[in-house]
Swiss-Prot record:
UniProtKB keywords: Cell membrane, Cytoplasm, GTPase activation, Membrane, Nitration, Phosphoprotein, Repeat
Domain pG1 pseudoGTPase: 590-763
Residues with PTM 3'-nitrotyrosine: 550
SMART domains: FF (SM00441), RhoGAP (SM00324)
Disulfide feature: none
Alphabetized CDD domains for the sequence: pseudoGTPaseD_p190RhoGAP-B, RhoGAP_p190
Amino acid composition bias (Basic and acidic residues), ranges on this chain: 1141-1151
Provenance organism: Mus musculus (Mouse)
Localization of this protein: Cytoplasm; Cell membrane
Domain annotation FF: ranges: 267-325, 366-420, 427-481, 482-548
Entry protein name: Rho GTPase-activating protein 5
Modified residues (Phosphoserine): 590, 765, 951, 968, 1115, 1196, 1203, 1219
Role of this protein: GTPase-activating protein for Rho family members.
Membrane topology: Peripheral membrane protein
Length: 1503
């Protein structure tokens, strides 16, 4: 029963695989493939198949359990399913022969039979023999599967005879076939079935295979199966066929041809491979690893099938290839990304076509590496190439690897970039050309559509080249520009017509009649018509403008952030805050004044004498003054000391003040120069603010040997210099005494120093002042128009650069306070800076003592706004007009600027206001001296202005004279004249430093109120207030006339008839008196009588006014009025420092407006105003104005007391522009007459040597020219260096040689050259203008001028030759007479100036301009010689001719035809060109007598 229940065991067969075996001699160097055949059948998976099996074993391996000392291997068993579904188990035995690895002979075994007999054995026995897997198993049996041969014995059921049909293995096929034949014979004896397996058919040799088939065909039932263990082809078929032969029930064996079986197997592999590759394609991250992926796929059937067929190694290789492809794809994308971003990088680093157009690729690479943005676009990797670094994984780093640029692709992109730039340049050029074409089409108006214009440009080349989108874009841009420009011009036109809008009160609404009037006036303007197609926009702009005019605020200002009010507030907020910080530091450094350090400056031993006198009056250097003891540290320095500047200021000695003592014109001139240098250097270096504020005191020494001879001259000169320098002047006390210095002088000077120091401490006190406005002596409003083309700091610099400037009352963000000496006292002046639109409310509602009206000479609208504002200002209020432009040259080169500046001066002349020009390129005008005369005028009229203001506001009596402001509690002492440091960084001429800065000189009309000092300077008459001809009140006391003294005959620089001239000048009264009695001539008067004595010497102790005059008996019955001004308003007189001489006259009429005083203003207003004024008609207004002003003009002569001197400091290159009143015809006639008389009295010309500008000793500068050159180097080294520097770096500098360079830089250049002749100017970082100034200074310092004095007359005569060619040849012959050294240098300099003039379109320096700048330097004129004044223009034209005709004079070239060849100037009537007694300069551009017809006495022309 049990047996029946047991399942039947599947049949089991043992197959023995046999074939050629033995030593290498028998079988060759490889086997016939028995082991591979067994391996592939038993373990068919690719990972379990081992292609290498060895038969050479060691004794140990041979004796191991796997081989077990047998010459056969047990491969295990495999269960196989037949086609009928019946299973069978097949045990596989391989019969082989193992070779000893020592002897290379077969191992000795228990069976000693040869292989042929052993292989044919049907019974095999080996106890505990293990299954063989691979060679590595031997010796390591425990690491592999251990499976024993069943029961240690097996019976062989069939044989599989292997025959190798491949080539090679160093054996002959015939020998193998012979061996096989013998083996087959033995196998046949066993009566077991045999099948031949043709192995290695994948490397089959057909001939061998045919022999095998032939061999088999000769045998009965011997089948041949073609196999390949490598590709697993027909392996299973061999064993299946053998089993079928053993078991007849399984059917007949089916042998498949090799090729068919191979194809079937390969198809199976390809299908599995495709499925596996698709499986691998699901992996997209090239960072994935095989281990991770295989673990995820190990259960997938496609994965398992491929692993079985191809193995893990191939699967890994397939995966690796896929990962590599992913990586390469990623790299490719990154490369494409980099290549695509290269154009953008090139555009960033190499945007300029001109720079790279001619560069090759390598040069472009080097250029890119130098760019600052290189690191933003490219990254230089430490390792290359870039695609093998981790940079490929930095997705967020978009920088391009620099080594990528070494590829051809990158170079191609660069070439494309260059071509793109070329094409883009062409496209832009065409767009711009098209734009210019549109600009040339005049009929294109703002707002015109493109369709109306397109038909006119269809044939244009540029239009055809660019695209339609480009053409529309260009036209749209053109339309925007012309519309914006038209709107700006329309707005500017509205400002130019400011008089049309500013006639209504603020916050008013314009009526329909007014609007109609506005449209009527404006409709005639082309700028109004230009916006015809944009009428709504035009109306909007007009209404916006009107709305702003009638409701002006800085928030709604049409200039936006460029509103003057906003800019002023911002500037003052920062500037005043910085001043406060500086004051705090200065205050803490200057509080101790128990010890006084005094610097005493003098000439010819005067300083030491004064120091000795002070020590005589001291006790152990302690000086008693006003009950206090001061320790004095005196440091006298003589003018001849070479280290005078270095001695002034040291770390150990910081002076509190400087006593400047003089007793002659020379010593006074030296003092003026020295103080100017100190202040200039202090302001430029700004190393110590205290040095800038150093107080100076001028002390006049007594002259024991010539008492009263030239004392008046020195007194006048000293007082004038003190006024200019804003410092005290200590006069010689009255009476006679034997010593040079009086104790009272020393005490007065010391008090002045102490008071100055005390005042400076008050000014710089860290406690904010912010005093109430009521404490201000004067309130000035400065007006400027919004949007003018200059910065507000330019017009405010005269105030902000002054140390006496401080903040105004808290809350007043647009005001500042000035402490300034006006008259004889220090005054507090409030300056309020406003826009014109903000000033209108101030003009109507607040008290203003004076207006400073600023306008741009480049802008008509600025002048229009000024006219509109000025027209409504009361004529009692003084006005200062200020025209602002870039440089002096603008007046000569720009007609529009010339017209506006002329109009400004013309208006100023008509209303008797002051006028000045301010240049942004000039430093000199940035000083408060610009407004000093204006402040004096305002202070003089203060009471009249306040009374008029009260009269208008309270409607009280016009005779009311009470001051609006409370009198200032401050009391000013006579010696409280403190200097303004920053204001005087450059003292007025003649004390300004050498340079090209424009200087303010009074016009001839202004000089009628002045006398000329010994230096050619004008100064007010001593002790006389600064009154003007144009005042309405003519009851002015005459000037005090000091008693004349007989001068010494040897006084330098005096005209022969000095005494008579002085007396005549002092005796003249330029004012019109109330009496009609004619004045006596000066020569008819007794020189010892008729001189008014100042009453301060008599009534000072009684508290009377300083300006009361006592009149002696007058033998000529001349009437001189005496006014006792303390009768009315004594307190106001004391406050102002002037007599109230105007209040009475002005109290008799109601003030008018300036538009009724100016024909220009009224004509403008009349053209606008259509309605009738309520008070009077236009004619009545003019008649009234004329009647009140009739007869107030009277010409006044200048007093030619002294000859001008040192005019090379007077700004020859830049003539001053300053005038403040009208000029009389008689004056010009008198001057012309005087010049003719002076020519008759001319004297022999003397050699003139100006003093050197240097303040240090030099062994080079100032030396004779012959000492500085050699035959090898005929040009001085310094001249060569300067010229080379200028021509290398500055030929195109605007204003070269005209614009002044920094004087400190000029001095440093010469000092450095003194120390080292090999200096490099470029390394000094100095400006071209500084080098140009140093070059001019070199020639100015030469002992003799470059053009010798001896040849001046010949040059003058040659220049008068009418014929141009003859004149040039005559000049050429004269030049040949130069000393050889002078000739070489002169040729070098003129050649250089010719090169400069060739760039005149850029640097604006024509030959004419250069000659103006250079001829005084080259010819060294003697301005003391009046005869010379009439020939200045001729000398200048000579130098201009040399520059223009440089090639002709020096290089035998042809005469150059110039557009403005200078003709010889007329020799007659020189007075029409140059005024006598005026420092040489170009004709003043803004003086009415030179640029416009002479004004009549009545400018309105009513009579």
């Amino acid at each position: 029963m049990m047996a029946k229940n047991k399942e039947p065991r599947p049949p089991s067969y043992t197959v023995s695989v046999v074939g050629l075996s033995g030593t290498e001699k028998d079988k060759g160097n490889c086997g016939v493939g028995k082991s591979c055949l067994c391996n592939r059948f038993v373990r068919s998976k690719a990972d379990e198949y081992y292609p290498e099996h060895t038969s050479v074993l060691s004794t140990i391996d041979f004796g191991g359990r796997v081989v077990n000392n047998d010459h056969f291997l047990y491969w295990g068993d495999i269960t196989q399913n037949g086609e009928d579904g019946v299973e069978c188990k097949i045990h596989v035995i391989e019969q082989t022969e193992f070779i000893d690895d020592q002897t290379f002979l077969p191992h000795r075994s228990t069976n000693l039979q040869p292989y042929i007999k052993r292989a044919a054995a049907s019974k095999l026995q080996s106890a505990e023999k293990l299954m063989y897997i691979c060679t590595d198993q031997l010796g390591l049996e425990q690491d592999f599967e251990q499976k024993q041969m069943p029961e240690g014995k097996l019976n062989v059921d069939g044989f599989l005879l292997c025959i190798d049909v491949s080539q090679g293995c160093n054996r002959k096929f015939d020998d193998q076939l012979k061996f096989v034949n013998n083996l087959f014979v033995q196998l046949s004896k066993s009566k077991k079935p045999v099948i031949i397996a043709a192995t290695k058919c994948d490397e089959c040799v057909d001939h061998y295979l045919r022999e095998v088939q032939a061999f088999a065909s000769n045998k009965k039932n011997l089948l041949v199966v073609e196999t390949s263990a490598r590709f697993n082809v027909n392996i299973e078929t061999c064993f299946t066929a053998l089993v079928q032969m053993l078991d007849k029930t399984r059917g007949k064996p089916k042998i498949i041809p090799y090729l068919d079986a191979y194809k079937t197997q390969r198809q199976l592999v390809v299908t599995a491979t495709d499925k596996f590759e698709k499986l691998v394609q699901t992996v997209r991250d090239y960072h994935a690893t095989w281990k991770t992926v295989s673990n995820k796929l190990k259960n997938h059937p496609d994965y398992e099938e491929y692993i079985n067929l191809e193995g893990t190694r191939k699967a890994r290789n397939t995966f690796s290839k896929h990962i590599e492809q992913l990586k390469q794809e990623h790299i490719r994308k990154r490369r494409e990304e980099y290549i695509s971003t290269l154009p953008r990088a090139f555009n960033t680093l190499l945007p300029d076509l001109e720079e790279i157009e001619h560069l090759n690729w390598l040069e472009a690479l080097k250029l890119m590496e130098k760019r600052a943005d290189f690191q933003l676009c490219f990254v230089v990797l430490e390792k290359t190439p870039w695609d093998e670094t981790d940079h490929i994984d930095k997705i967020n780093d978009r920088r391009i690897p620099f080594d990528l640029l070494s590829t051809l692709e990158a170079e191609k992109v660069y070439q494309n970039h260059v071509q793109h730039l070329i094409s883009e340049k062409r496209r832009i050029e065409m767009k711009e050309k098209f734009k210019k074409t549109l600009e040339k089409i005049q009929f294109i108006s703002p707002g015109q559509p493109w369709e109306e214009v397109m038909c006119f440009v269809m044939e244009d080349e540029a239009f055809k080249y660019i695209t339609e989108a480009d053409s529309k874009e260009v036209y749209g841009r053109h339309q925007r520009e012309i519309v914006e420009k038209a709107k700006e011009e329309f707005q500017e036109m509205l400002f130019e017509h400011s008089e049309l809008f500013y006639d209504l009160d603020l916050n008013a609404t314009p009526s329909s009649d007014k609007m109609s009037e506005i449209h009527t006036v404006l409709s005639e303007e082309p700028r109004y018509k230009a916006l015809q197609k944009l009428a709504p926009d035009r109306e909007s702009l007009l209404l916006k403008h009107i709305g702003f005019v009638y409701h002006p605020t800085k928030e709604t200002c049409l200039s936006g952030q460029y509103c003057t009010d906003i800019k002023v507030e911002n500037l003052l907020a920062t500037s005043l805050l910085e001043m406060d910080h500086n004051r705090v530091r200065l205050y803490h450094d200057s509080t101790n004044i128990d010890k006084v350090n005094l610097f005493i400056l003098g000439k010819d031993g005067l300083a030491q004498e004064l120091a000795n006198e002070i020590r005589t009056q001291s006790t152990d250097d302690e000086y008693a003054l006003d009950g206090k003891i001061y320790e004095l540290d005196l440091r006298p320095v003589d003018a001849k000391s070479p280290y005078i500047l270095s001695q002034l200021w040291t770390a150990a000695f910081k002076p509190h003040g400087c006593f400047c003592v003089f007793n002659s014109i020379e010593s006074l001139s030296f003092i003026g120069e020295f103080i100017g240098k100190i202040r200039t250097e202090a302001s430029q270096i700004r190393k110590d603010k205290y040095m800038t504020n150093l107080p100076f005191t001028l002390i006049l020494a007594n002259q024991r040997d010539s008492i009263s001879k030239n004392l008046p001259i020195l007194r006048h000169q000293g007082q004038q210099l003190a006024n200019k320098l804003q410092c005290p002047f200590v006069d010689v006390p009255t009476g006679t005494y034997p010593r040079k210095f009086n104790e009272s002088q020393i005490k007065q000077a010391l008090r002045g120093v102490l008071e100055s120091v005390k005042h400076n401490l008050d000014v710089v006190s860290p406690v904010p002042i912010n005093k109430d406005v009521s404490e201000a002596d004067l309130r000035i409003v400065m007006c400027a128009m919004c949007g003018d083309p200059f910065s507000v700091d330019l017009i405010l610099s005269p105030f902000l650069d002054s140390h006496s400037c401080s903040a105004a009352q808290a809350g007043q963000n647009n005001s500042l306070m000035l402490d300034k000496i006006i008259g004889e006292k220090r005054r507090r002046i409030q300056i309020t800076i406003l826009s014109y639109h903000s000033s209108i409310g101030v003009r109507k509602d607040e008290l203003v003592h004076g207006y400073i009206l600023v306008y741009s000479a480049k802008r008509k609208a600025s002048m229009g706004m000024l006219r509109a504002f000025l027209s409504e200002v009361q004529d009692t209020i003084p006005v200062q007009l200020v025209a602002v432009t870039d440089s002096q040259a603008d007046f000569f080169e720009n007609e529009a600027i010339k017209e506006l500046m002329t109009e400004g001066e013309h208006i100023a002349t008509e209303i008797t206001a002051k006028f000045t020009a301010l240049y942004s390129l000039s430093q000199y005008h940035r000083q408060t001296e610009v407004f000093t005369l204006f402040f004096s005028d305002v202070l003089e009229k203060k009471n009249m202005i306040e009374n008029s203001y009260l009269s208008d506001n309270t409607r009280e009596s016009t005779h009311q004279s009470e001051d609006v402001f409370l009198p200032s509690p401050r009391d000013c002492f006579p010696y409280n004249n403190y200097p303004d440091s920053d204001d005087d960084t450059e003292a007025p001429p003649p004390y300004s430093p050498i340079g090209d800065d424009v200087q303010l000189l009074p016009t001839p009309s202004d000089r009628s109120r002045y006398r000329l000092d010994l230096e050619g300077n004008e100064y007010p008459v001593h002790s006389t207030p600064n009154c003007h001809d144009h005042e309405r009140n003519h009851k002015v006391p005459p000037p005090i006339k000091p008693k004349p003294v007989v001068p010494k005959t040897n006084v330098k620089k005096l005209d022969p008839n000095l005494l008579k001239t002085i007396e005549a000048g002092i005796g003249k009264n330029p004012r019109k008196q109330t009496s009609r009695v004619p004045l006596a001539h000066p020569e008819d008067m007794d020189s010892s009588d008729n001189y008014v004595e100042p009453l301060d010497t008599i009534f000072k102790q009684k508290g009377y006014s300083d300006e009361i005059y006592v009149v002696p008996d007058d033998s000529q019955n001349r009437i001189i009025k005496i006014r006792n001004s303390f009768v009315n308003n004594t307190q106001g007189d004391e406050e102002n420092g002037f007599s109230d001489r105007t209040s009475k006259g002005h109290g008799e009429r109601r003030p008018s407006k300036y538009k009724y005083k100016s024909k220009t203003l009224f004509s403008k207003a009349k053209s606008y105003y259509r309605r009738t004024h309520s008070d009077a008609s236009d004619d009545e207004a003019f008649t009234t104005s004329k009647t009140k002003r009739k007869g107030r003009h009277r010409g006044s002569e200048e007093d030619p007391l002294l000859s001008p001197v040192e005019t090379w400091k007077g700004g020859i290159d830049n003539p001053a522009i300053t005038s403040d009143q009208e000029v009389d015809d008689k004056k010009i006639k008198k001057k012309t007459h005087k010049v003719k008389e002076d020519k008759k009295q001319k004297k022999k010309t003397k050699t003139f040597n100006p003093p050197t500008r240097r303040n240090w000793e030099s062994n080079y500068f100032g030396m004779p020219l012959q000492d500085l050159v050699t035959a090898e180097k005929p040009i001085p080294l310094f001249v060569e260096k300067c010229v080379e520097f200028i021509e290398d770096t500055g030929l195109c500098t605007e204003g070269l040689y005209r614009v002044s360079g920094n004087k400190t830089d000029q001095d440093n250049i010469q000092k450095q050259f003194d120390q080292d002749h090999n200096i490099n100017l470029a390394s000094m970082e100095v400006t071209v203008n500084a080098v140009a100034g140093a070059l001019k200074a070199f020639f100015a310092d030469l002992p003799d001028p470059l053009i010798p004095y001896s040849l001046h007359p010949e040059l003058l005569e040659a220049a008068k030759i009418p014929d141009k060619t003859e004149r040039f040849h005559a000049l050429k012959e004269i030049v040949k007479k130069f000393h050889p050294v002078n000739y070489d240098v002169f040729r070098y300099v003129i050649t250089h100036l010719n090169r400069v003039s060739q760039q005149n379109k850029i640097n604006l320096m024509t030959a004419d301009n250069l000659s103006i700048c250079f001829w005084p330097t080259l010819m060294r004129p003697d301005f003391e010689n009046r005869e010379f004044l009439s020939t200045t223009k001729i000398h200048q034209s000579v130098v201009e001719t040399f520059i223009q005709q440089c090639q002709f004079f020096f290089y035998n070239g042809e005469i150059v035809e110039t557009a403005n060849t200078v003709a010889p100037p007329p020799t007659s009537n020189p007075g029409q060109l140059v005024e006598s007694m005026v420092p040489l300069q170009l004709p003043p551009p803004l003086q009415p007598q030179l640029i416009q017809p002479q004004l009549q006495t009545d400018p309105l022309g009513i009579i």
